[in-house]
Amino acid sequence: MLKSNNASETAAHKVGDKTAKKVFFRRRKGCPLSVPNAPVIDYKNPELLIKFVSEGGRMLPSRITNVCAKKQRKLNNAIKIARILALLPFVFQAK
């Protein structure tokens, strides 16, 4: 019986510890392309577009880049056009 009581006590402590913790949520920053003096999204600006492409050449999602949905669509279209015009590579080579 002692073993079962100890097991239930430790389980109660674990549950109590979970409820005692406060969860901290980080406040999301705004869209970096919606602020005043932000660069214009254009397929002719590969320096800007390459910031939103991963090391392997894939477009980064907005949850990583914190770009709003409207600007994310413009970015995706600009990256696709820049790839077709050979301003950006489709796949980056590993170094």
From Swiss-Prot:
Binds as a heterodimer with protein bS6 to the central domain of the 16S rRNA, where it helps stabilize the platform of the 30S subunit. Signal peptide: none annotated. GO terms for molecular function: small ribosomal subunit rRNA binding; structural constituent of ribosome. It comes from the Bacteria. HAMAP family: Ribosomal_bS18 (MF_00270). Part of the 30S ribosomal subunit. Forms a tight heterodimer with protein bS6. PANTHER family: 30S RIBOSOMAL PROTEIN S18, SMALL RIBOSOMAL SUBUNIT PROTEIN BS18M. The keyword rRNA-binding applies. Keywords: Ribonucleoprotein, Ribosomal protein, RNA-binding, rRNA-binding. Pfam families: Ribosomal_S18. This is Small ribosomal subunit protein bS18. Belongs to the bacterial ribosomal protein bS18 family. The lineage of its organism: Bacteria, Pseudomonadati, Pseudomonadota, Alphaproteobacteria, Rickettsiales. One of its GO terms (cellular component) is cytosolic small ribosomal subunit. GO terms for biological process: translation.
